[in-house]
Amino acid sequence: MRSRAPLALMEQTVMVLIFALAAALCLRAFALADGISRRVESTDRAVLWAESAADTLKARNGDLSRAAAELGGEVDGQRWTILLDENWQETAGEPAYTLTARPVQTGRPLLGKAQIDVVQKNGERLFSLEVCWQEAKT
């Protein structure tokens, strides 16, 4: 009579391999979900910063200097730039994210417009929006 031990050992080996495969698939799914979560969080933060910049520009009638004085950042000619670190705090060092607002010509009297972009340090645009406001008559 033959022993059933090799058959049981083979069955256990197959079960361990199936378990290892399932564990590897689960780890890959969790890693993918973590990456997606980080991208979505960055996009959410970019939207918040862009909307804050847009609201500040509208409240200041498109005056980049006054908007920068209120929200932060620097104005360089016709561009307002805010440098942000990986925690979305303003930084003077190497930025992880950059918010840029620049005026855009509308071709219409009494209508001001600006383009606001938030980009990662690798150049990938996270969020972009245009903001318009009514300029005061002079």
What name fits each language-model region?
Residues 20, 24-27:
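Alpha-helical transmembrane segments
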Residues 2, 12, 28-29:
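Short hydrophobic/aromatic segments of transmembrane alpha-helices and their interfaces
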Residues 1-7:
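N-terminal leader/signal peptides at the extreme start of proteins
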Residues 7, 14-18, 30-138:
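Flexible, low-complexity segments enriched in proline/glycine/serine and punctuated by aromatic residues
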